[in-house]
Each structure stands twice: as structure tokens, then as C-alpha cells.
A protein has these predicted regions:
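Polar, surface-exposed loop/tail segments
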Residues: 102, 247-266, 270-321
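Intrinsically disordered, low-complexity regions enriched in proline, serine, glycine
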Residues: 12-14, 33, 92-93, 201, ...
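Substrate-binding rim/cap in mid-to-C-terminal beta-strand-loop elements of soluble/periplasmic
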Residues: 52-69, 168, 219-274
Length: 321
């Protein structure tokens, strides 16, 4: 399950999504005397402090996250295709029209059809970039998306399934509008958790880059840092079975390792293929697979000493923090 909010830094999420962050935090370990203690036996959550964007705009990051390559490579295959090929029921919800999404981000990719799809396409309602509540039928736009996502997750509770909920609530210059979605996201996650509908599920809450829209923040060091460090939080179910022990150890260590969208892409592939993932060939320009040669699954060991932003040809290395 992917919860994607465009243009949200980790710091902004902590400020404006306080209830949602508390949901993730209650599954994080803490020091209890000489040992680590875990609040919940079957769930564990992680936050990634050094998750770094490639560019300060979506087209420079989105294809890497979900296609495993840059927009310069033509006919990219969306990760969803591999999910469908492996029997997953797929769902996609967005507050941006498919036509606009295709024009802006996906003109270099192959189109993909989901089993279920919901789009809010009224331009009088979406008002992307505007620092106001974006409402439809008396509720914030995101309410309808997350409600549809909940219906999907409930209907297919006994099936292998994938859901991507994509919103632009962080895509405005005041950094305030995002807070109106906090209750919506929190209630969505809490409801599924209380009904035990997150079992055998990994939740990835992610953004492609931090806040970048024109505002007074452009003049501050605050902008320079947050714009390059988007949020990434992961909730894993069934912690005790991570072969789990090595995988758990690695993802815990990787919270403090320099990572990118390539690692996010490979993590989805690892979740999909499990132990077979290590035998999958790397993606090349002629050969498309769910594994990028430029990244590693967050459940695997990543040597921090070999992570250098200068090794990525398409990264603005001067912005690294």
C-alpha cells in the first residue's frame, strides 16, 4: 500500500500530520534500559532520515520511484504491471486528472490500466497549488480518495492487493493546507488497523521531494534542506517473521543511510517477489525488470561507505545535505 503526497518533506510531515505521525511512531522501537523494546508485537515502523530527492520537481523523481529509471529512457514500465502479472488486484486514486498526469509525468512511459481507479478531475475543485481547502460535496478532496481506498481494501481483504493513493495536498506555498488531511489519513490507517486489515501488508508513505513552491521560504536555508529531504515512512506487518531477522536488521540500519528513489523502487520489487528477488536481473535500457541497478532493497544491506551522491548522474549533487 502506497500513500503518496507530492512535495512533502519529512520535517513538514512531522509538523502538519501530527496524528498520522503518532500512528507510525507507536510502532517504532525505543530504548528500555539495556534493551530495545517494541510497542506492538506484530508491527514495526521505520522513518528514513537520509532519503534524498534527485531534483526539486516531480518529473525528476517520480519516474525513478515507480518506473525505476529516469524520464530520459523511453517506454518505461510501471511497477504496477509486475504486480498484476503476479495476481495482485490493483487500485489507483488521485486528485489529479489522468490526462494531466500523463502530460506532466508520464509522456515517456507506457500507459497502465488499473483494476480499480478513482480520479477527481473537476478543475474548479482540484485547484492544485492553491493554499486553501480543496473540497468536493462538503468534504476535503482527500476524504473521497481515502474513503474509496478503504472500500477497496475492505472488499478485497482476502486477496493479494495493491493500492496507491496519490494526492497533492502538500503542493502549495504556505505549508498549511496539508494539516487539513491529517485526520483523514489517521482515521484511514487506524480503521484498517483496528479491523486487522493491515495484516500481511506493508504501508509506504512517501513523497518525491520536499517543499519547492515559490514563497518566502525560497530565501532561507530551511528551504534548501527541506526541499531535498522528502518523507518516507514504512510500516511492516509480522516483524517476527522477517527471514526475516536479517531483513529487519538491515532496514533498521538503513534508516540512517543515504537512500534514493531507486531504493524505494527496488523495495517494492523485493516485497513483490520475496526471496526470488535476488535472482531477478537488473533493469537495462533494453531489458525492463522490477530491479534497478542503481538501488537496493531497503530490506537488504546497504553499505553507507559506498553511497556517494556523485555516483548518480542525474542528481543535483550541490543540493546534498
Amino acid at each position: 500500500m502506497i500513500l503518496y503526497i507530492d512535495s512533502v518533506s519529512r520535517a513538514l510531515a512531522l509538523r502538519q500530520l501530527k496524528k498520522t505521525m503518532k500512528f507510525f511512531e507507536k510502532f517504532m522501537p525505543y530504548h528500555g534500559g539495556h534493551h530495545m523494546k517494541y510497542p506492538e508485537e506484530n508491527y514495526h515502523s521505520f522513518q528514513f532520515f537520509k532519503y534524498h530527492s534527485f531534483r526539486m520537481f516531480t518529473p525528476g523523481n517520480f519516474p525513478i520511484l515507480f518506473y525505476g529509471n529516469t524520464k530520459e529512457v523511453k517506454d518505461l514500465v510501471l511497477m504496477t504491471r509486475y504486480l498484476k502479472e503476479n495476481g495482485y488486484v490493483t487500485n489507483y486514486c488521485s486528485d489529479e486528472c489522468k490526462k494531466d498526469n500523463t502530460r506532466t509525468h508520464h509522456n515517456m512511459t507506457q500507459s497502465e490500466i488499473y483494476d480499480h481507479q478513482m480520479l477527481l478531475c473537476d478543475p474548479n475543485v482540484v485547484l492544485m497549488n492553491k493554499p486553501i481547502k480543496k473540497c468536493l460535496y462538503g468534504n476535503i478532496n482527500s476524504y473521497h480518495l481515502y474513503n474509496y481506498g478503504k472500500q477497496f481494501w475492505t472488499k478485497y481483504k482476502d486477496n493479494r492487493k495493491f493500492s496507491a493513493l496519490v494526492t497533492n495536498d502538500g503542493h502549495e506555498s504556505t505549508l498549511e493546507a496539508l494539516k487539513y488531511t491529517d485526520d483523514i489519513i489517521y482515521n484511514y490507517l487506524t480503521s484498517l488497523y483496528d479491523q486487522n486489515l493491515l495484516k500481511d501488508t506493508t504501508v509506504l508513505m512517501v513523497s518525491d521531494h520536499g517543499t519547492v513552491l515559490p514563497s518566502i521560504y525560497f530565501l532561507s536555508d530551511f528551504f534548501q534542506k527541506e526541499g531535498r529531504l522528502p518523507m518516507l515512512f514504512i510500516l511492516v506487518n509480522d516483524r517476527k517473521n522477517m527471514s526475516y531477522y536479517d531483513q529487519y536488521y538491515h532496514i533498521q540500519k538503513n534508516q540512517q543511510t543515504f537512500i534514493t528513489g531507486y531504493d524505494f523502487y527496488n523495495t517494492i520489487g523485493h516485497l513483490l517477489y520475496g526471496d526470488k528477488y535476488k535472482d531477478i536481473e537488473n533493469k537495462t535500457n533494453e531489458h525492463d525488470t522490477p530491479k534497478s541497478p542503481f538501488g537496493e532493497s531497503l530490506f537488504n544491506y546497504i553499505n553507507p561507505m559506498k553511497r556517494n551522491p556523485k555516483n548518480y548522474q542525474n542528481m543535483d549533487t550541490h543540493i546534498c545535505k
